[in-house]
Amino acid sequence: MAKFKIKKGDMVQVIAGDDKGKKAKVLQVLPKQAQVIVEGCKVVKKAIKVSEKNPKGGFVSKEMPMSISNVKKAEGDN
């Protein structure tokens, strides 16, 4: 398993994909999959089934993991 320089809470810039150019905070690092979850990037709508907890069901927006190679540390952050 490789060691990554990007940690939870770091400010990163997306360098590839639909969110290219965005600067945001890392919410979670998934080292085994070499992926990160970045706040407000790669957002998808997930369907929620009807249940006791959620009687109406519906949709929820959620950030999905992206490859760690698609982000770099933002300039000026150490």
Curated annotation (Swiss-Prot):
Pfam families: KOW, ribosomal_L24
Superkingdom assignment: Bacteria
GO cellular component, one term: ribonucleoprotein complex
UniProt GO molecular function: rRNA binding; structural constituent of ribosome
Coiled-coil region(s): none
Ribosomal protein found in the keyword field: yes
Name of the protein in its database record: Large ribosomal subunit protein uL24
Lineage: Bacteria, Pseudomonadati, Campylobacterota, Epsilonproteobacteria, Campylobacterales
